[in-house]
Each structure stands twice: as C-alpha cells, then as structure tokens.
Amino acid sequence: MSAYPQDTYFNSNPYQQQPYAYQPPPQPQPQQPPYQQQPYQQQAYQYNAQQPYQTTDPYAYQQSPPQSSTVPPQSPPVQVTHSPFIRTDSSQAVSFTDMARMAGRPQTFDEMYSVPESFLEIEIRNPMTHGIGRKMYTDYEIVCMTNIPAFKLRHSAVRRRYSDFEAFRDILERESTRVNIPPLPGKVFTNRFSDEVIEQRREGLQRFLEIVAGHPLLQTGSKVLCAFLQDPAWDKSQWI
C-alpha cells in the first residue's frame, strides 16, 4: 500500500480535470438585407406667385423672393430707329428731343449738340413767277443741306421750274428700274399762278424730292440726282 491516504493523493494531483460547466451555443442572429441606394428622384415643380421657381427638392436652388411685391414690372425700353434723313417740314420733323422722349429716356449731351452721322435736309421755298402772257412760268428755290458723301456740296441752292421736275423724273425712271419713282403733283390748267395753287404745287414737289433724295439706291446709283439738286447750270437737254 501506498504511504499516502487515497484522498490525499487525489487532492494533490495537479493534472486532475476540473468539472466543466455547460454553456449553450449562441443563437444565430437574423441577417439584415444588404443596403441598396435609392435612385435620385426629382421633386415635382410647384408654382408659387411670390416665388415662381420654388421646388420641394431640398437640394435645389431657391430663388430669393422679391424685395417688394408692390413694385410694378418695368417694360423693356422702346428701341427707336433713327432715320438719317430729317424732314424739313415742321409738322413732320422728328428731332433728337422727340426721339429721346419716345424712347422713354432723357436726352444726352451728345444727342443735343452733336451733328448726326448722316443727314439730308431739302426745302423748296420762295416761288417766283416770271414772264408775261403765255410765257409765264413759276420756278422754286431748292435748298439742300447734307453731309452724305454722295452729294458733292454740303450746302446748295438752285432754282427749278415744273417742267424741269418732269424731265428729272423721266431720267430717274430710265436710270433706276428697280426703284418706283413717286408721281409729281398734277398739272393745273386754270388759275395756275394763284397763290393757293402755287403753294399746293410747292408742297407736292417738296414731298417728291424728300422721297427721291432720301432713297439709298438713288443716292448711290443715280447720276442725275445730285446734279439736279445742286448744279445751278443744270440743263435737262443734256440728259434727255
């Protein structure tokens, strides 16, 4: 027999296995579905009178509201085309002051005092009757002021009678087939030397020259236009 008691032997054994406490296995956790990024959806547009570009999208740009809703909307400025040809008749003339007023803006210093880029002023005035009996006729003074290069003189004054205007119009029709030449005032057979008839004819000749001399095709393509308006020695027999 061993010299040590049995209970002392088992207690002193260093390799004796200790009793194992049972632990249940961990329960499996339910699996979460994988994360899926939702596609970007644009929010519907909502109209707002105070802020017409407002949307429900938090990332959209929001326009700031107007400072005051009582301010009336301003209409766009009126664009006025400045004609290079100014009519000399005071009832039909359009000055730079009138054009600035029509445009809705104050007139500038340059518009008040500068010379227009191109202008043409024609005036028929001072009718005079010459001769006696059947040889009586009336001629008119044509005053022309311009800075258009097509005209040789900046200021000129010549006298023409009605028959000169008739020849001038016929020559223009032959020279410029693409331009419709306006008619002359009609002939008068009774009381043609009265003041009323002469004034009516003067106004008709004035309108005729304003249309003809202001036409750009006639200014550059006609040879008789400048000569008729500015040459004192103009003779219709040289052009017929």
Curated annotation (Swiss-Prot):
Name of protein: Sorting nexin-3
Membrane association type: Peripheral membrane protein
SMART domains: PX (SM00312)
Compositional bias of kind Low complexity: 34-54, 62-84
Region (Disordered) residue spans: 1-85
Sequence ranges of Pro residues compositional bias: 22-33
Domain comment as written in the entry: The PX domain binds phosphatidylinositol 3-phosphate which is necessary for peripheral membrane localization.
InterPro entries registered for this protein in UniProt: PX_dom, PX_dom_sf, PX_Grd19_PX, Sorting_Nexin
CDD domains: PX_Grd19 (cd07295)
GO molecular-function term, one example from the UniProt record: phosphatidylinositol-3-phosphate binding
Family of the protein in this entry: Belongs to the sorting nexin family.
